[in-house]
Amino acid sequence: MNKEEFINKIHGGLIISCQALPGEPLYTEEGGIMPLMAKAAQEAGATGLRANSVRDIKQIKKIVDLPMIGIIKRDYPPEKPYITPTMKEVDELVETGVEVIAIDATLRPRHDGKTVNEFIKEIKTKYPNQLLMADTSNFEEAKNAYEAGVDFVGTTLSGYTEESPKTDHPDFDLIKALVDAGLPVIAEGKIHTPEQLKQVIDINPAGIVVGGAITRPLQIAKTFTSVFEN
């Protein structure tokens, strides 16, 4: 799938992120739960998916035929990047045939010692036809990653790094600035409500991802149970 085909499939619809990490209620060693989430997402009208781990991606692909953004979350302390942080994770994801691979494209120090520009160049040299998405937290990071060769820039990490504003809502200003700059933006992060989604739609990015507000029942339930604590 090329860049234009991917945009045509996802634009005007919603990419739903289906993830569960160790320690979360929906995580199991053998998997099997995220494919059901993905199936529900497809039946609800999602135009794409975002998934974590080779296992989940492969299991989802067996029952759902939506285009997918794939990542591998793997910690390499003390460095902070953990979303597809090295070529090892990229190699694993390429083997799954996932349509887009997302990487941490912040300017923070990396486990492999490379700059993010060197990492992007290495990926695009090894896998020239692989679509690549940059998970970033601010305008500088996104612009840098796009100029380095990624196909899409995501606002995924805004609010989660020291280099971005701490808010409890989507970074509307960042999404708009990137769209206005002519970058292919996948808006993601802290979209909690349909009203916030509508605001993002009005900015008209190439794609939009919603995750926790749909597929993390513990997080969703807490928004209700917390009412009793106030």
Swiss-Prot record:
<dbReference type="GO" id="GO:0005975">
    <property type="term" value="P:carbohydrate metabolic process"/>
</dbReference>
<dbReference type="GO" id="GO:0047465">
    <property type="term" value="F:N-acylglucosamine-6-phosphate 2-epimerase activity"/>
</dbReference>
<comment type="similarity">
    <text>Belongs to the NanE family.</text>
</comment>
<dbReference type="InterPro" id="IPR007260">
    <property type="entry name" value="NanE"/>
</dbReference>
<protein>
    <recommendedName>
        <fullName>Putative N-acetylmannosamine-6-phosphate 2-epimerase</fullName>
        <ecNumber>5.1.3.9</ecNumber>
    </recommendedName>
</protein>
<comment type="pathway">
    <text>Amino-sugar metabolism; N-acetylneuraminate degradation; D-fructose 6-phosphate from N-acetylneuraminate: step 3/5.</text>
</comment>
<dbReference type="GO" id="GO:0019262">
    <property type="term" value="P:N-acetylneuraminate catabolic process"/>
</dbReference>
<dbReference type="InterPro" id="IPR013785">
    <property type="entry name" value="Aldolase_TIM"/>
</dbReference>
<keyword id="KW-0119">Carbohydrate metabolism</keyword>
<dbReference type="Pfam" id="PF04131">
    <property type="entry name" value="NanE"/>
</dbReference>
<dbReference type="InterPro" id="IPR011060">
    <property type="entry name" value="RibuloseP-bd_barrel"/>
</dbReference>
<dbReference type="GO" id="GO:0006053">
    <property type="term" value="P:N-acetylmannosamine catabolic process"/>
</dbReference>
<comment type="function">
    <text>Converts N-acetylmannosamine-6-phosphate (ManNAc-6-P) to N-acetylglucosamine-6-phosphate (GlcNAc-6-P).</text>
</comment>
<keyword id="KW-0413">Isomerase</keyword>
<dbReference type="GO" id="GO:0005829">
    <property type="term" value="C:cytosol"/>
</dbReference>
